[in-house]
């Protein structure tokens, strides 16, 4: 059963300013929480196109959203191909798009997917099970320098060198096969005082490997650009991020596209061609309420940013 508590449900969907006859995109279908709430607000003319690369999520959505067959189009794909698949559907512009980044609870909670440092399972971490690169390959075959780079860049792990060295020493004896083995190596590499603070000692390294396996940051950056391109004037994009790297991409993109360019001094009116592409709906990110945090601890690190296309 695909059970997943949706984060910032109403804030994200209501922030899109739903038009009942509009066309919307959920780039991260997951447990279908956002999609369900959005579909409930559409008329028979409204449409939702939902992306996911996880077969389990798509099958679950087919079952729970069977009442909305006429309005819902499910696409098995990474959202980096957003424009391509919209074109296939004959869709050139949409009224709203949402992204809920990060791993869905069922992926985290299914040990054999290899995302979780709480279960011993084969090293995997592929969002798309048909993809070739897995966590096992990264851990066992990538060079020491590359491991240090991803642990530091994607995990902001200050003990990156020590952890990469431990991995290198261990894999020379025999391949590292499971998440449990990797967790033990990480714990051995981190000094005891540091292990006792800042959450689970493997959290940052697991995040870094997952981002590398799925090329998450580049994929998101590309997809966000495409999303803004296909929005109608007045259309909105809602983005939920779960760590500072994703949030930085979103914040920077929104800021660049909502800022005025350098203009000659003394212009009485800003020429239309110089008006920024976006208007910020949220100056500061929206975070989960205390009530939501009590029900769903995974919402703690969630940040929601919303922008509207001006032209």
Curated annotation (Swiss-Prot):
One term under GO cellular component: cytoplasm
Region (Disordered): 287-311
An MF annotation (GO) of this entry: rRNA (cytosine-N4-)-methyltransferase activity
Regions that span the bilayer: none
Location in or out of the cell: Cytoplasm
SUPFAM superfamilies, A to Z: Putative methyltransferase TM0872, insert domain (SSF81799), S-adenosyl-L-methionine-dependent methyltransferases (SSF53335)
InterPro entries: RsmH, SAM-dep_MeTrfase_MraW_recog, SAM-dependent_MTases_sf
Induction or repression: Transcribed at a low level in exponential phase, it may be further induced in stationary phase. Part of the mraZ-rsmH-ftsL-pbpB operon.
Keywords: Cytoplasm, Methyltransferase, rRNA processing, S-adenosyl-L-methionine, Transferase
Primary enzyme class: transferase
GO biological process, one term: rRNA base methylation
Consequence of gene disruption: No visible phenotype.
EC number: 2.1.1.199
Biased composition, class Basic residues, residue ranges: 300-311
Pfam family, one: Methyltransf_5
Binding site for S-adenosyl-L-methionine: 32-34, 52, 79, 100, 107
Catalytic activity line of the entry: cytidine(1402) in 16S rRNA + S-adenosyl-L-methionine = N(4)-methylcytidine(1402) in 16S rRNA + S-adenosyl-L-homocysteine + H(+)
Family per similarity comment: Belongs to the methyltransferase superfamily. RsmH family.
Function: Specifically methylates the N4 position of cytidine in position 1402 (C1402) of 16S rRNA.
Protein name: Ribosomal RNA small subunit methyltransferase H
Species whose genome carries this gene: Bacillus subtilis (strain 168)
Gene: rsmH
